[in-house]
């Protein structure tokens, strides 16, 4: 985050926008100081842009993984309000882990670091060599298969526990099918979902 001061909050915001080359809509800020004395006024803001968050994420990932002796390249982009960062490396299997467990841990570390640094919960997704994208395609395919089974049998289907992002893909895919509804149940790593038939 960067800090800017001015006689008023608006003044500090204007300085930040000018310096960072962004519009006020692209600037996220919080007022850290505002005094209104008889002889002097002063305001201070701490601010950031999405581009600053992207740079922070890429730098943090590279630092963590290069310290662990991995050679990596990172590419980030923003889509639908979510920040995506893809890690390119020759050590995918090690960094992804069994069933993606290491990749989920990396995501958790990065999300927590971003929330702490920028004092806001932001949607962040870290992938390694397109693993999650391929995994989501498989999950979507499974969802269609499970949906057809429930439509045929009209019996509820309970799925094994899965990560939140994969459950989301399941929910979205089933929502495209008529006469079906989904529900998430359970807590933490045991959270699972059910698919039910509805008239």
Where are the model-predicted features located?
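RNA-contacting regions in translation and RNA-metabolism proteins
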Residues: 1-199
């Amino acid at each position: 985050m960067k800090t800017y001061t001015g006689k008023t909050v608006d003044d500090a915001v204007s300085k930040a926008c000018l310096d960072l080359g962004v519009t006020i809509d692209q600037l996220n800020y919080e007022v850290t100081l505002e005094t209104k004395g008889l002889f002097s006024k002063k305001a201070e803001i701490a601010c950031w842009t999405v581009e600053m968050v992207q740079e922070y994420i890429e730098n943090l990932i590279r630092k963590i993984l290069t310290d662990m002796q991995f050679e990596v390249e990172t590419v980030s982009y923003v889509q639908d309000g979510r920040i995506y960062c893809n890690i390119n490396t020759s050590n995918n299997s090690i960094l992804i882990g069994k069933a993606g467990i290491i990749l989920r841990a990396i995501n958790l570390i990065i999300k927590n670091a971003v929330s702490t640094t920028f004092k806001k919960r932001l949607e962040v997704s870290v992938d390694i060599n397109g693993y999650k994208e391929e995994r989501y395609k498989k999950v979507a395919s499974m969802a269609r298969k499970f949906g057809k089974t429930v439509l045929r049998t009209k019996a509820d289907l309970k799925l094994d526990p899965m990560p939140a992002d994969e459950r989301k893909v399941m929910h979205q895919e089933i929502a495209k099918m008529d006469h079906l509804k989904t529900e998430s149940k359970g807590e933490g790593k045991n959270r699972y979902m059910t698919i039910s038939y509805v008239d």
